[in-house]
Amino acid sequence: DFPDLNWDDNKLTEEHTQMLYESYNPEHYQELLFSNSGYTGPNGENLISMRQYYQSESGDSYSVAGQAAGWYRASKPASFYGGNSPTTDNDLNAQELVREALNQLAQDPSINLADYDIEDRYDYDGDGNFREPDGVIDHLMVFHASVGEEAGGGVLGPDAIWSHRFNLGRTHVLEGTSSSLPDRFGGQYAAFDYTIQPIDAAAGVCAHEYGHDLGLPDEYDTQYTGKGEPVSYWSIMSSGSWAGQIGGTQPTAFSSWAKHFLQKSI
């Protein structure tokens, strides 16, 4: 979260989001992402978790597991990270927010980073084995303390961060950590890829951004040409990530193309 927008004083109202909770504590995200039995919605209903979504879509052949950590406080106001570039309209310093979160994560004694380094997604040693540690955190998901800019940004408006999947430009070493690979990053862990989601995220946006981290592209009109979207709500990688009476809580399936891609690649 931010010095001027705390996770437990986030200024959210019903005008900003349908996913309004009294508390967005780490336990909320643990259930949202990794529960086998769903998580509690804002009206007390049971909603599908990201884990359940991936299990259902894969016929129980793929699942996700992890740990929700934090919250960690950024060093600068929210607008420093989410303010838009005058030339590209992209968030100015979202990557810096991720780096700051990683630096604090590295000092968190409750986190065993070895649990999150089981893949060698870029085959750094060239041995053809992608199922081995490489010293890099496999799938990093960061949540920020505002509504996403794609949904209006809440009190931050255009200074909010737009949900996305990207990388840090270069590997970011987590100083003070210790990995099992002394020849990489000085024997410390590092991070490269990440996704970032809003405080009020439902499973739809989480599963969508995680889909990008697995290699899937967007299936909507990313150039906003106005020509329409043939896929639309038929895929979570398009408008389907917003499906549900409460937007994003009942994401639609992966498209047949996306399922074919995932079947071949993971």
Which residues are covered by each model-predicted region?
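Extracytoplasmic/secreted proteins, especially bacterial periplasmic and envelope-associated proteins
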Residues: 19, 93-100, 104, 201, ...
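Extracellular hydrolytic enzyme modules, especially secreted metalloproteases
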Residues: 139-141, 145-266
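N-terminal nucleotide-binding beta1-loop-alpha1 segment
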Residues: 8, 32, 46
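Active-site-proximal segments of metallohydrolase catalytic domains
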Residues: 37-181
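Fold-level signature of zinc-dependent metallopeptidase catalytic domains
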Residues: 1-19, 85-86
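Structured segments of extracytoplasmic/periplasmic soluble domains
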Residues: 19-23, 32-36, 104, 108, ...
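Generic low-complexity segments that are intrinsically disordered, proline-rich and/or Lys/Arg-biased
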Residues: 4, 78, 110, 252, ...
